């Protein structure tokens, strides 16, 4: 099996397919094919450290051969789910893709200390959410989630802004980092984390039909009465902007 030492950089080469010379090659580095016109992952290398696919009309991740990858960036693609994704990824980024609507696929775990970024997609359910390792950042901002059922009880940073959630039931109880929840439709604090070791960023809103909840000082007081927050609280007056 052939081996290449170093990164393979093929971004913005106007490629329509992955060159067949790379089929089954082991790359001791990253593999970058961003911003081409590649539609399938035929001829994909056998293994590499990091995968950069963004900006291609790729409709499926089928073709990736390795079971583990440290970093996978899949922004601005045409995939609708995670079919073909490696079984374990440390950092996965899926952004700016309104066709993406499901976690169905082969992904089983986000590694310890890693991150899951799924942002600006049509994801509406956490069915098939992979196992989340220790101290993982989860960013699910600006999707179409209406429920957090299926989330782990503990994570590192948690960002859930821009979703039509009316409560946080099913969400993490313990956040070891920061928590962001702007532009929400929350009606109450049901499911709100019990412990947040970092900072909190939220939009204020008229929860409980109480106009005082639009007053920052009152909102923060209510928040801290329900949750042990180690850091500071940053509140925005822009709410229910979805």
Task: Locate each region found by the language model.
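N-terminal capping/linker segments that flank leucine-rich repeat
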Residues: 1-26, 31, 213-242
């Amino acid at each position: 099996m052939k081996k290449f030492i170093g990164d393979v950089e093929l971004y913005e080469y106007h490629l329509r397919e992955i060159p067949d010379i790379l089929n089954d090659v082991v790359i001791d580095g990253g593999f970058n094919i961003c911003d081409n016109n590649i539609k399938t992952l035929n001829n994909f290398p056998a293994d590499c450290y990091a995968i950069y696919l963004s900006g291609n009309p790729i409709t499926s991740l089928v073709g990736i051969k390795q079971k583990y990858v440290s970093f996978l960036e899949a922004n601005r693609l045409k995939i609708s789910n995670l079919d073909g994704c490696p079984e374990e990824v440390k950092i996965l980024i899926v952004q700016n893709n309104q066709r993406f609507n499901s976690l169905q696929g082969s992904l089983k775990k986000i590694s310890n200390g890693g991150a899951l970024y799924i942002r600006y997609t049509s994801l509406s359910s956490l069915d098939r959410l992979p196992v989340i390792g220790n101290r993982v950042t989860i960013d699910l901002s600006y999707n179409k989630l209406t429920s957090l059922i299926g989330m782990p009880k503990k994570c590192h940073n948690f960002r859930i802004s821009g979703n039509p959630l009316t409560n946080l039931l099913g969400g993490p109880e313990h956040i070891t980092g920061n928590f962001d929840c702007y532009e929400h439709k929350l009606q109450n604090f049901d499911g709100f984390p019990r412990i947040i070791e970092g900072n909190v960023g939220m939009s204020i809103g008229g929860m409980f039909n109480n106009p005082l909840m639009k007053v920052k000082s009152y909102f923060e007081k209510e928040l801290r009465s329900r949750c042990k927050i180690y850091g500071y609280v940053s509140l925005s007056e822009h709410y229910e902007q979805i």
